[in-house]
Amino acid sequence: MIGLPNGARVWLACGVTDLRNGFDGLAGLVQTKLAEDPFSGQLFLFRGRRGDRVKVLWWDGDGLCLFAKRLERGRFVWPQSTSGTVHLTAAQLSMLLEGIDWRRPRRTHKPEFAV
């Protein structure tokens, strides 16, 4: 993934979004539904109805960037709320994009005794 700029905030848009929206449609949703400025340099995440696709909208200072990801297996973990936003850290964003439950990360392997 492209590195996040220092101080960039990450916002997850709760609920389902029509991912047929592109740059302008998602920027409009950021303004109307989330009451945020899409040109602020913050990242805005949207999830589709099936839960296996997300789009990330981000202003990099020169123009809007739109990133998309589709999981081949599983679904992206999303809040149950149907409206509003959730703030994520960069680490939580990385986990989310890998398909990991960012709300309750767990070890997959417990360390054993060192020999």
Question: Residue spans of the language-model regions?
Answer:
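Polybasic/polar functional segments that serve as interface/processing modules
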Residues: 1-115
